[in-house]
Swiss-Prot record:
The modification Phosphoserine is found at residues 220, 538. Residues 86-131 are annotated as: PIF-pocket. One of its GO terms (biological process) is positive regulation of mitotic division septum assembly. Residues 55-315 form the Protein kinase domain. GO terms for molecular function: ATP binding; protein serine kinase activity; protein serine/threonine kinase activity. Its EC number is 2.7.11.1. The keyword Transmembrane does not apply. The PIF-pocket is a small lobe in the catalytic domain required by the enzyme for the binding to the hydrophobic motif of its substrates. It is an allosteric regulatory site that can accommodate small compounds acting as allosteric inhibitors. Signal peptide: none annotated. ATP binds at residues 65-67, 84, 134-136, 140, 183, 197. This is Serine/threonine-protein kinase ppk21. Belongs to the protein kinase superfamily. AGC Ser/Thr protein kinase family. PDPK1 subfamily. The lineage of its organism: Eukaryota, Fungi, Dikarya, Ascomycota, Taphrinomycotina. The keyword Hydrolase does not apply. The gene is ppk21.
Length: 551
């Protein structure tokens, strides 16, 4: 049970856990088993065995919206782990208990498979939850893609095989990951794959564990824009085959250097996904092409299964039985055996598409008619793809991080149907009497007296800047809005801080502070509308001067 009034989670809501194999490997009797629901509140089942005091905590090696992952060393065994520390107060406040449980329960179900990051313990104190995880010291797949741009064919083949093997095991246990991407694929000390981040996984009911890959289940929009499958966009459903779509996207990115479906905003990405608009470089190994043509299909039932993928020519040299005991090939760049130059790829960068924008766009996209895309895809035996020499120009990551719920789809109902939301982000709004003298932003003691209110800022394609809050019964409404194209509206960005800006109209002034601490991701969009207002005002002034001269 949750004590919402005092922002507490009882221990029965998130019972502790210890991996049985952890004790058996040491010849110990495991006094703790995965917990049932009849737990006495306020007690810790393994508190006497493991607690924060049993570890030496080191550097932060990862963080999320309500958790941090720290490198830690067991004081008795001196073995290193990655401990995920979660804030209980935030979990309750943001209704994340479900997702915390999903992550723990998924990892408990998958524990022991070599391609899945292992959960050894969970324990807690009054303020925090602790997940003791297997340490993956060699980082994530994305960093190697960034470093080498195009991975060697042998690397791609071996790691694609390990990822596929891990997906096969997940599905056999009734787990759909729903957010497979290079950031969630780690490497252990021997450079073998470790899939992690199960906070948005879907745990299937027992009767559906062995269901066909194309069986669909209702799903909210979770995941990452560049890797989501068409069925999530069109019908708000997910299947085991959705993970295989994402798998194909990851393999493509390993060998090409960028995701197959990318764009400047979520809508562009989703349109490309639904129309199967992707390209293949001319230097791509011919054996790998069927992997993409058989997985990039609109209908889940038209995609190849895991067993069929294993039989593709690209994996002909893979020995599946001892895959996890083999020595991985050295990580290196692709080196063609023939004298064809690979053009220089532009520098890698992350897109400015926010998680909120991706969720909003997905909601809008799902409501649009896409039947024509599906009918076209059904008539095609194989999708038509273009072949080109140069790698794709750029790619980005519109990421919905683990445990982060998508922005409420009702946001789109708050603006006229003729407008599109091009940016949505969490901000703090502080009303002030007027623009500070000399355009100086408050600092020091004066900042303490500002009344900050957390809101969601929506920016539309016509220059509307609206601030949304929740009323009674969780009803969303626009508390205030300004027209950035209005010549009476003043927008000033703080030259000394990248996290805030100021808006003033004829009546009121507000300081807007971005929750993430970075307003640069949408600064240009706002200034573009403000420039339009300035040009209109300038033309109006010139016309008045001309009229006065004629008089």
């Amino acid at each position: 049970m949750m004590d919402l009034e005092h922002k507490r989670i009882s221990r029965s809501t998130l019972p502790d856990y210890a991996d049985p194999d952890y004790f058996e490997a040491r010849g110990e009797r495991n006094p703790v088993k995965p917990q049932s629901s009849n737990v006495v509140p306020g007690t810790s089942h393994i508190g006497s065995i493991k607690s924060p005091a049993d570890y030496v905590f080191g550097d932060i090696i990862g963080d999320g919206s309500f958790s941090k992952v720290r490198r830690a060393t067991d004081k008795k065994s001196w073995k290193e782990y990655a401990i995920k520390v979660l804030d209980k107060k935030y979990i309750v406040k943001e209704n994340k208990v479900k997702y915390v449980n999903i992550e723990r329960d998924s990892m408990m179900r998958l524990n022991g498979f070599p391609g899945i990051s292992r959960l050894f313990h969970t324990f807690q104190d009054d303020l925090k939850l602790y997940y003791v995880l297997e340490l993956a010291p060699n980082g994530e797949l994305l960093q190697y893609i960034k470093k080498y741009r195009f991975l060697d064919e042998n690397c791609v083949r071996f790691y694609a095989a390990e990822i596929l093997s891990s997906i096969e095991y997940m599905h056999s246990c009734g787990i759909i990951h729903r957010d497979l991407k290079p950031e969630n694929i780690l490497f252990d000390g021997n450079m073998h794959v470790k899939i992690t981040d199960f906070g948005t996984a879907k745990i299937l009911p027992p009767k559906y564990v062995n269901s066909p890959d194309y069986t669909t289940f209702p799903s909210s929009f979770v995941g990452t824009a560049e890797y989501v499958a068409p069925e999530l966009l069109s019908r708000q459903v997910v299947s085991k085959s959705s993970d295989l779509w994402a798998f194909a996207c990851v393999v493509y990115q390993m060998i090409v250097g960028s995701p197959p479906f990318h764009g400047s905003n979520p809508n562009n990405i989703f349109k490309k996904i639904m129309s199967l608009e992707y390209e293949l470089p001319k230097l791509l190994p011919p054996d790998i092409v069927p992997l993409f043509s058989h997985l990039f299909r609109i209908q889940p039932s038209d995609r190849s299964t895991t067993q069929q993928i294993k039989q593709f020519p690209f994996f002909a040299t893979i020995t599946w039985d001892n895959l996890w005991t083999q020595d991985p090939p050295p990580m290196q760049s692709f080196r063609p055996n023939y004298n064809i130059a690979i053009p220089n790829a532009p520098a890698y960068y992350r897109s400015n598409v926010t998680a909120a924008a991706a969720a909003n766009a997905a909601a809008a996209f799902a409501s649009a008619s896409i039947v024509k895309h599906q009918e076209t895809a059904r008539r095609q035996e194989l999708p038509t793809v273009n072949r080109f020499t140069a790698p794709t120009a750029h790619y980005g990551y519109a990421s919905l991080r683990s445990h982060q719920m998508p922005v409420d789809r009702l946001y789109y109902k708050l603006v006229p149907s003729s407008e599109s939301i091009i940016e949505s982000t969490s901000v703090f709004v502080s009303p002030i009497p007027s623009v500070p003298e000399g355009n100086k932003f408050p600092s020091g003691l004066s900042k303490m007296f500002l009344k900050r209110k957390q809101r969601v800022m929506l920016l539309t394609d016509v220059g509307r800047c609206a601030f949304v809050c929740k009323g009674k019964h969780e009803r969303l409404f626009i508390e205030m809005e300004v027209n950035l194209k209005d010549s009476s509206v003043v927008v000033i960005f703080d030259e000394n801080s990248s996290k805030r800006f100021l808006i003033e109209d004829k009546v009121q002034s507000w300081i807007i502070e971005d929750s993430s601490g970075d307003v640069t991701k949408y600064k240009d969009k706002i200034l573009k509308f403000a420039d339009v207002a300035s040009s209109h005002q300038s033309r109006s002034s010139e016309e008045n001067v001309e009229e006065n001269e004629e008089e």
